[in-house]
Swiss-Prot record:
Its cofactor is a divalent metal cation. Its EC number is 3.6.1.9. It comes from Brucella abortus (strain 2308). This is dTTP/UTP pyrophosphatase. PANTHER family: BIFUNCTIONAL DTTP/UTP PYROPHOSPHATASE/METHYLTRANSFERASE PROTEIN-RELATED (PTHR43213), BIFUNCTIONAL DTTP_UTP PYROPHOSPHATASE_METHYLTRANSFERASE PROTEIN-RELATED (PTHR43213:SF5). The keyword Nucleotidyltransferase does not apply. One of its GO terms (molecular function) is dTTP diphosphatase activity. GO terms for cellular component: cytoplasm. It is found in: Cytoplasm.
């Protein structure tokens, strides 16, 4: 494959890998970019998602420079942020964080922002930002405790995974479902196609 058609995913997220596979896209390399994800003072959730996706893409691109076979590859990165109003919810790592997230989301509308950034072989950036609005039903103590016991919340933005048990909490969703999972598929495929990646190459090969 032409090096300019090689794709590096700057994320180790199984959900993002699966979503790309759903569109017939298999990255040539998985290269997670480790960056400081701390929000800046008074930073809007939308701005945070955009900035982090850009920083991840740039870092991965820089790390691959001079590496045989990948220095001219396309680099794709994404970051998902969940917010209630302007309050950014954490990627829950401990149960108390997840409990607080679920308490805040209970009966409320919240927004999920995913920034997607593509670094072209010449180093130029292409970005998009997708917003989805959701509302959870009012959660009982039983529901919250049961969900916490499942462990699905661990490492998830906002303390839940919509593609799992928490999908049963959703009363209303406006926008991209795959955005909430972690990668807005329609917009990402469009970004890759515009960047010169052969997104439809595998559709007629039986590899999808």
């Amino acid at each position: 494959m032409n090096v300019q058609h090689k794709l590096v995913l700057a994320s180790g997220s199984p959900r993002r890998i699966e979503l790309l596979g759903q569109a017939g896209i298999e990255p040539d390399r998985i290269h997670p970019a480790d960056i400081d994800e701390t929000p800046q003072r008074a930073e809007h959730p939308r701005s945070l998602a955009r900035r982090l996706s850009r920083d991840k893409a740039r870092k991965a691109h820089e790390q691959l420079q001079g590496e045989a076979g990948f220095s001219g590859a396309l680099v794709l990165a994404a970051d998902t942020v969940v917010a209630v109003g302007r309050r950014i919810l954490p990627k829950a790592e401990i149960e108390d964080e997840a409990r607080e997230c679920l308490r805040l989301l209970s009966g409320r509308t919240h927004k999920v922002f995913t920034g997607v950034c593509l670094v072209l072989p010449n180093g130029n950036l292409r970005q998009t930002l997708v917003e989805t609005r959701l509302r959870f039903e009012r959660l009982s103590r039983l529901q919250i405790n049961a969900y916490l016991s499942s462990g699905e919340w661990r490492g998830k933005a906002g303390g839940y995974a919509i593609q799992g048990l928490a999908g049963s909490f959703v009363v209303k969703l406006v926008g991209s479902y795959t955005n909430v999972v972690g990668l807005p598929l329609q917009e990402t495929v469009g970004l890759l196609a515009d960047g010169g990646y052969p997104v439809y190459a595998n559709w007629g090969t039986g590899k999808v």
